[in-house]
Amino acid sequence: MVGEEKMSLRNRLSKSRENPEEDEDQRKPAKESLEAPSNGRIDIKQLIAKKIKLTAEAEELKPFFMKEVGSHFDDFVTNLIEKSASLDNGGCALTTFSILEGEKNNHRAKDLRAPPEQGKIFIARRSLLDELLEVDHIRTIYHMFIALLILFILSTLVVDYIDEGRLVLEFSLLSYAFGKFPTVVWTWWIMFLSTFSVPYFLFQRWATGYSKSSHPLINSLFHGFLFMVFQIGILGFGPTYVVLAYTLPPASRFIIIFEQIRFVMKAHSFVRENVPRVLNSAKEKSSTVPIPTVNQYLYFLFAPTLIYRDSYPRNPTVRWGYVAMQFAQVFGCFFYVYYIFERLCAPLFRNIKQEPFSARVLVLCVFNSILPGVLILFLTFFAFLHCWLNAFAEMLRFGDRMFYKDWWNSTSYSNYYRTWNVVVHDWLYYYAYKDFLWFFSKRFKSAAMLAVFAVSAVVHEYALAVCLSFFYPVLFVLFMFFGMAFNFIVNDSRKKPIWNVMMWTSLFLGNGVLLCFYSQEWYARQHCPLKNPTFLDYVRPRSWTCRYVF
């Protein structure tokens, strides 16, 4: 279609060049028609008609022109990034993961993914929203969200003033959600110090003694066993025990559990990326052992990536104003979510608890939860994947800011999963999907994809179960069954805009289902507590049988 439109535009231009005499003949009547008649007055109606005709012709040519210019611009940017990816960009030492020179077919710039044996390519680039927000039309959407926040604040203040007769500036929900914060701080420090010391110490001992050991296999199995004990026993059960034993509130639990998962993934990446280098060094009988420095490992623990490299592309300076703006937007999103719960969620579930559980109540709850659920989705994406990661990237001068792609343009769920969270997707792609294919066989791609879905679904459900203090596998069912089915059915071959509409519709509905089901279960467990709950009471849905007592 684009090729035909280009040819149509070129044909029109070529015809105008080939027949200048005809064009001149066509212009003459137009000139004559605009000339003043014998009475000295200009025919206004004729002038307006001519102007409308010229405008219509310009509008007709506009889409062809814009598509041709856009196509040339895309080709130019693609070639430019492909060339820059092959260079040592700003101190980005690609070492063994550098791009092979002399290849005839370079990798597409939109993916910027090297072959599996070389790993992810890091290059200096900005986040997509930073570029889009420079466009006035996109920035207006940002301003709309700010205006909506102002209206939420005004609505809350006015309602509280009418009900209480005074301005109520208490943020009881926020103070409750982030309660017992000192426990969060010392737990985080223990997790950080253990992740900083134990994996590095174990790897250093194994790497220095591997080539000298008379039983390298036993030595490797021993250190690998100790590393697994640390990952599962200390970093796995330790934080979980703290959040349960100290009965931390939900937001405080989320901080600890998310940091726990992040440290586990970081430690795995550090070992996974460096073990092959030591094995290759021993195989080549090199005199030096490639052990990263402590500073390199420490930088990686704070860098906004889950893929270890000895060095990354770095920006020359830190823009502290930009850092302050990103953190300010994060705190703004926290208050935004607070007002969404106060003005949209709390009234909804206060009314729901007055009726027994039924299909009608459930359907109304799901559809009434779509708007707050979608707003929370947008705010979570913007606060964490854009603002939080960009703030740390700027402080560390980390150059590669592609934490997400244009997931909102996805016409398939497979593309949505790849572009929504690039940071986590890269880890799953290289250490779960590719390692599964390497360990078993490249023929089992569907099984590898299923394994990745299972790992992701289990980790998500684990985080929700621990943070909310109950097991209610709604997310697991949506992710493992519907999400996986959509991934195969609505695949990358779907390119028409209608599939983007379908993707958004299902995404909206899914967020409404999640917010409705988990909120109902939360309220049910608050209003229908059990005196001596058993293990089954933690996994059996309380909202199905709870009858609220007032």
Swiss-Prot record:
Tissue: Expressed in most tissues, but most strongly in the adrenal gland. Expressed more strongly in liver Kupffer cells than in hepatocytes.
Function of the molecule: Catalyzes the formation of fatty acid-cholesterol esters, which are less soluble in membranes than cholesterol. Plays a role in lipoprotein assembly and dietary cholesterol absorption. Preferentially utilizes oleoyl-CoA ((9Z)-octadecenoyl-CoA) as a substrate: shows a higher activity towards an acyl-CoA substrate with a double bond at the delta-9 position (9Z) than towards saturated acyl-CoA or an unsaturated acyl-CoA with a double bond at the delta-7 (7Z) or delta-11 (11Z) positions.
UniProt free text on domains: Each protomer consists of 9 transmembrane segments, which enclose a cytosolic tunnel and a transmembrane tunnel that converge at the predicted catalytic site: acyl-CoA enters the active site through the cytosolic tunnel, whereas cholesterol enters from the side through the transmembrane tunnel.
Organism of this sequence: Chlorocebus aethiops
Transmembrane segments: 139-160, 181-206, 219-244, 253-276, 320-352, 370-395, 444-468, 475-490, 497-528
Biological process according to GO: cholesterol efflux; cholesterol homeostasis; cholesterol metabolic process
Name of the featured protein: Sterol O-acyltransferase 1
Keyword flag Protease: no
Originating gene: SOAT1
Disulfide bonding pattern of the chain: C528-C546
